Amino acid sequence: MNQSSLLAEFGEPITRVENALQALREGRGVLLLDDEDRENEGDIIYSVEHLTNAQMALMIRECSGIVCLCLTDEQANQLELPPMVVDNNSANQTAFTVTIEAKVGVTTGVSAADRVTTIKTAANPTAKPTDLARPGHVFPLRARKGGVLARRGHTEGTVDLMQMAGLQSAGVLCEVTNPDGTMAKAPEIVAFGKMHNMPVLTIEDMVMYRTEFDLKLA
């Protein structure tokens, strides 16, 4: 079955986006699938301002463990986060910066609580580069300007969702994995969403929504 058939029970594309935005406003997570001909993988996404230790623990337990903080260009520049590598030749051009850790309020930086502290420190509107140590256990990602209309990636989808929901622009994502360590595809993502009461939507849904309502985001 393709994504459209699998996601039909979550409503039409516009409904799926609106349900996801409401869930984020309520402090719940959502599951975002990218295109079937891209990765066809699903990420858990949470807003930074509502992020809890329990939510972080779920991401560490059920996902790849590579917890990423999605930032706008402006936020990444404010923190003076350089690219992880000078020459990014990864297949999907994922814009990793150097990894980070909060300088205050953490121990080893690995625990759920420590990662939440690092993320909230970095996403604070008044954050300074000196608030963070490098390297660390949180992986910032720099979203491309134009969001999903410019790049159909989970990074851009995360930042777009936060802005569309009227929340702080920064969001957190982690790729969902199966119990055997393989990557969760659409059927497993749908089952995961039902189990954890998380709306499921796609990058394509977001592109349609932004185009339909002519949404201009930062």
Swiss-Prot record:
GO terms for cellular component: cytosol. Mg(2+) 2 binds at E39, H154. The keyword Magnesium applies. Pfam families: DHBP_synthase. InterPro entries: DHBP_synth_RibB-like_a/b_dom (IPR017945), DHBP_synthase_RibB (IPR000422). One of its GO terms (molecular function) is magnesium ion binding. D-ribulose 5-phosphate binds at R38, E39, D43, R151, R152, G153, H154, T155, E175. Pathway: Cofactor biosynthesis; riboflavin biosynthesis; 2-hydroxy-3-oxobutyl phosphate from D-ribulose 5-phosphate: step 1/1. Keywords: Lyase, Magnesium, Manganese, Metal-binding, Riboflavin biosynthesis. Mg(2+) 1 binds at E39. One of its GO terms (biological process) is riboflavin biosynthetic process. The keyword Magnesium applies. Its EC number is 4.1.99.12. Its cofactor is Mg(2+); Mn(2+). The record marks H137, E175 as: Essential for catalytic activity. It catalyses: D-ribulose 5-phosphate = (2S)-2-hydroxy-3-oxobutyl phosphate + formate + H(+). It comes from the Bacteria. Catalyzes the conversion of D-ribulose 5-phosphate to formate and 3,4-dihydroxy-2-butanone 4-phosphate. Belongs to the DHBP synthase family. NCBIfam families: ribB. This is 3,4-dihydroxy-2-butanone 4-phosphate synthase. The lineage of its organism: Bacteria, Pseudomonadati, Pseudomonadota, Gammaproteobacteria, Vibrionales. The gene is ribB.
